[in-house]
Amino acid sequence: MSSEVETQQQQPDALEGKAGQEPAATVGDKKVIATKVLGTVKWFNVRNGYGFINRNDTKEDVFVHQTAIKKNNPRKYLRSVGDGETVEFDVVEGEKGAEAANVTGPEGVPVQGSKYAADRNHYRRYPRRRGPPRNYQQNYQNNESGEKAEENESAPEGDDSNQQRPYHRRRFPPYYSRRPYGRRPQYSNAPVQGEEAEGADSQGTDEQGRPARQNMYRGFRPRFRRGPPRQRQPREEGNEEDKENQGDETQSQPPPQRRYRRNFNYRRRRPENPKSQDGKETKAAETSAENTSTPEAEQGGAE
C-alpha cells in the first residue's frame, strides 16, 4: 500500500516538473506557467477592461486584462473578449494568482470581441474635406498666363472667355446668390399686389398715377400697409371730389374765400349799417306813403 501511495505522489510531481520545464520564455517579469491553453470566457467588462476565463482542462478561473489580448477584432475600437467565447491563451504567474497573456482565438485567429464594445468607424480615418494641393497657386498662375496668351492670340468671344475661367471662381456666385433667393417671394408677390392695387384704384381714380405707385410700394414692403400712406388716399380722393364739386358750383356760387370776406366785412360794418338802413327804410316808407296818397287823392278828385 505504501508503494502505491508513493507512486501516485511521484506522478503529479513529475507532471508539474514537465509543465514547468516546457515554457522557458517569460512574459515581461512574469513567469509562464502554461502555453496555448483553451478556455471559455466567463465574463468580461468592457468599461473596466478586465474579466475571467475558465480553463477547459482544470476548470480554473484565470484573470484576464484587456492589455493581454494579442489579436483583437479589427472591427472593434477597444480590446475585449465576448462572454462565452472560446479563446486560446498563455497562463502566467501574477501578483494575486494566475493571469492570462497573449490571448487570441483558437489557432491564433483574432478574437471576436464583446458585443458591447464600440465598432471602429473606418470613414473617420480619411477627412471628408481636404485642402488645396501645395502647388495650387503655381498651377493657378500658370493657367491664368496661358489663358491670357490664348486670348491675345485668338481673341475669343465673351462666352468662350467665361468658359475658360478656373473652377474656383464658380464657387463664389452661389454664396452671393443666396441673398436674392430670400427676396424672391417679395418680387413675385409685388406684381400681384400691384394689380390688385390698380384694380382698386380704377374704381376711384384711374387717371392719376400716384395712388397706383403708392400701392406698388406697399406691395413691395408690406410693413407700410398700416402706416400713414393708407390715410392719405381718402384725403386725396376727398380733395379731388371737392375740386370737382367746386368746379360745378363755380358758375352758381362764388368761391369760399369771397364768402368769408363778405361775412367778415358784414360783421365789421354791422354797427354802422343799422342807422343808415333804418334811415333808408324810413325814407322809403315816406316816399311810398306819399306815392300811395297821391293817387288816392287824384282818384277822389276825379270822382
UniProtKB/Swiss-Prot annotation:
Compositional bias (Basic and acidic residues): 271-284
Composition skew (Polar residues), residue ranges: 1-12
Chief place of localization: cytoplasm
MF terms (GO), sorted A to Z: C5-methylcytidine-containing RNA reader activity; DNA binding; miRNA binding; nucleic acid binding; RNA binding
Domain of life: Eukaryota
Gene name linked to the record: ybx1
Record remark on domains: In the CSD domain, Trp-43 specifically recognizes C5-methylcytosine (m5C) modification through its indole ring.
Biased composition (Low complexity): 133-143, 173-187
PROSITE patterns (UniProt xref): CSD_1, CSD_2
Any Gene Ontology CC annotation: histone pre-mRNA 3'end processing complex
InterPro entries (UniProt xref): Cold_shock_domain, CSD, CSD_CS, CSP_DNA-bd, NA-bd_OB-fold
Protein family (similarity comment): Belongs to the YBX1 family.
Biased composition (Basic residues): 122-132, 220-229, 258-270
CDD domains for the chain: CSP_CDS
Important for C5-methylcytosine-recognition, annotated site positions: W43
Name used for this protein in its record: Y-box-binding protein 1
PANTHER family named among the record's database cross-references: COLD SHOCK DOMAIN CONTAINING PROTEINS
Keywords tagged on the record: Cytoplasm, DNA-binding, mRNA processing, mRNA splicing, Nucleus, Repressor, RNA-binding, Secreted, Transcription, Transcription regulation
